[in-house]
Amino acid sequence: MASPDWGYDGENGPEHWCKLHPIANGNNQSPIDIKTSETKRDPSLKPLSISYNPATAKEIVNVGHSFHVNFEDSDNRSVLKGGPLPESYRLRQFHFHWGSTDDCGSEHLVDGATFSAELHLVHWNSAKYPSFADAASQADGLVVVGVLMKVGQANPNLQKVLDALKTVKTKNKKAPFTNFDPSVLLPSCPDYWAYFGSLTHPPLHESVTWIIFKETISVSAEQLAQFRSLLANAEGDKEVCIKQNYRPPQPLKGRTVKASF
């Protein structure tokens, strides 16, 4: 999905995305600032059922604006069910967003507060669509689980991922990344918010049911620095660190944010 026509600063930055992607000003854009006093508890929201098989972890790829850990998604070995979802959704990849300093980096805010980073686990509706690409633009196509990350203690569960970054230092590099269960990165408290929104970078499809955990996970300053050491350039080109890769919050435009708690 990465293309040279967008980025996170200057004339390619988020406020200019609408020139090439008019949906950037749509009614269901993400991320948002979750105002807790305006969320609605929904008793019909069931607990999430998350079942990830570590054998489906496949590779890590530098996509130029972040890195993706990709999963084998030709079967239902790694799926998300329950919560607000009518179907089971298959895990495709996870990635992170971060900032140039420790006091920013998350895409979602809670009552105006920003966090140091954010983990996104991307799933697609395999019950209804033949592939991730087919699902990605459909209103019921995707579910992204978001986990807010707060600077503090080092998080040992992140270490395997961070250690792999040196194998994909530059854009388009990929390396095997196997035997990993990303549920170790989830908070222990099951409470979450849910709302309908979009991908947070171009093509910005309004195709995402968002599930944002209330509880944060920790990440240390040193671990955040490892994210920022990743390079946006291809091998041999002038070195440019990926210092920040988050989109500012978008207007809610009448949407309801539901709470499971």
Curated annotation (Swiss-Prot):
Q: What is this protein called?
A: Carbonic anhydrase 1
- Name positions with the PTM N-acetylalanine: A2
- The gene behind this protein is CA1
Principal location: cytoplasm
The UniProt entry's GO CC annotations, sorted and at most eight, read: cytoplasm
- InterPro entries with a match to the protein in the record: CA_dom (IPR001148), CA_dom_sf (IPR036398), Carbonic_anhydrase_a-class (IPR023561), Carbonic_anhydrase_a-class_CS (IPR018338)
**Record's catalysed reaction(s):** hydrogencarbonate + H(+) = CO2 + H2O; urea = cyanamide + H2O
| Ranges for region Disordered | 22-41
Q: Where is the active site?
A: H65 (proton donor/acceptor)
Species source reads Ovis aries (Sheep)
What are the subcellular locations of this protein?
Cytoplasm
| E.C. number | 4.2.1.1, 4.2.1.69
**Role this protein plays:** Catalyzes the reversible hydration of carbon dioxide. Can hydrate cyanamide to urea.
